Each structure stands twice: as C-alpha cells, then as structure tokens.
Regions:
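Short cysteine-rich clusters marking metal-coordination/redox-active sites
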Residues: 89, 101-104
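Cys/His-enriched microdomains
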Residues: 84-87, 99
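Short metal-binding segments enriched for Cys and/or His
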Residues: 111-119
Length: 119
C-alpha cells in the first residue's frame, strides 16, 4: 500500500518498505504514507526504506542500509542510517563525492540535470 515503483528498478532480496510513520499495535486510525522508487534505481539486499521517502532516478542504496530521507538522482547512500557517500552514473560507474570515478579517475559533472563524463 502506497508503494510506487517505476521502470527498470532493482530491488534486492529481503528489502523492507514501511508505510506508516507511527505504527502502533492497536491503532485503527493509521495513516499510510507513499514511497516512490524512481526509474533505474537500485536497492541492495536487506535495505529498509522508511515511509514517505523517494529514491531518485538511478540512485543506489547499499545492502543493509536504512533510508530515513529522500535520496536524489544518481546518489549513492550506504549505512545505518544511510549516509550520502558518492554518486553512480546511469551506466553504473561509481563516483566519489567530487564526481570522480573511483576506478578510472575520470571527472564527471551534472549537465542539464544529467550526470555526464567531462570531455
């Protein structure tokens, strides 16, 4: 209830989505809160996504992470609670917080809200 999953999303095994901000055992007056997972996002195994948050396009959530806030496009978040630890391109290239590839050292930048390699 209240979960919106867009196209090309990866959801790993045992991912948990909550849908009530204040769950109580005998609460008949609960309020379901919507969560949206945008196109191309990836959520690692055993992650927990708390109600009312949005996972941006092509964002990645590390395995076992607990997401307590909205995640932006192409952002990489890991940990409990999840913390912003870098970026990831639409093609899956991991970048540090300065938008530099951890593997090749190439620099990337956001151009018209799209993450692209600098020429």
């Amino acid at each position: 209830d209240g979960l919106i999953i867009k196209d090309d999303v990866f959801i790993g095994p045992n991912v948990t989505f909550t849908n009530d901000m204040n769950p109580r055992s005998k609460n008949v007056d609960y309020n379901l809160v919507s969560t949206t997972i945008k196109k191309g996002a990836s959520i690692g195994a055993n992650a927990t996504i708390l109600a009312g948050n949005e996972i941006g396009e092509y964002a990645m959530i590390g395995a076992g992470s607990v997401v307590t806030k909205t995640i932006g496009k192409n952002e990489l978040w890991v940990g409990n609670p999840a913390k912003h630890s870098g970026y990831i391109t639409n093609e899956g290239v991991l970048l540090d917080m300065n938008l530099v590839s951890k593997e090749t050292g190439k620099q990337y930048a956001f151009l018209n809200s799209e993450l692209r390699e600098n020429d």
